[in-house]
Amino acid sequence: MPRPANPETRSRLLEKGGELVSNRGFNATGVQEITAAAGVPKGSFYNYFDSKEAFAVAILTDYWDSVVATYGAILDEQGTPPLSRIARYFAGLAEFHHRHRYAVGCLIGNMALEVTPTSEDVRAKLAAIYRDWSGALAACLREAQARGELGAGKDPQQLAGTLIDAFEGAVMRTKVERSRAPFDNFERFVLPTLVT
């Protein structure tokens, strides 16, 4: 009879495995490396995840939950104008990448490029994350429209998607250049152009 799953072991697998995938890439990270980093026997991996693909979905869920927990409240701050909240939100995300020396990129973008061509489950998870992300930004943009801060002719949902696309592009550039310059360009040129 198999032993019952231990939530601490699962969390350790997600944390250590997520770090490895962020640093090396999904395809370059094996189950044995993940379990070794987490300090658990290799066979234990399959007590928590049906497959490496299921693990990918789980680390994406964990990563996105962390982003929402850390930065999501910025978009809901009622004492701050909506467009200022959006600028602060993206500045917070940029600061995260600065703290990591622009080396790891965004797990969402990395996995979209690396894994979606071969995994429908990962693609579906990423699509759900992008919808959630876009929805949170669009709600803030609708509030800006209602307050007269954003032109009535702009579609908040399309604008939110465009902001994400532009920011994710800046993340990729910072990873290549190991420089904050792409974020500075996003903040100085892209953000003001799109939201005024």
Task: Give residue spans per PLM region.
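Short hydrophobic clusters on alpha-helical segments that form packing/core surfaces
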Residues: 13-21, 93, 167
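Helix-turn-helix
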Residues: 12, 19-54, 58
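Generic hydrophobic, amphipathic alpha-helix propensity
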Residues: 9-18, 34, 59-63, 67, ...
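Short, solvent-exposed amphipathic helices
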Residues: 103, 121-132, 136-139
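Amphipathic alpha-helical segments used for helix-helix packing
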Residues: 85, 99-121
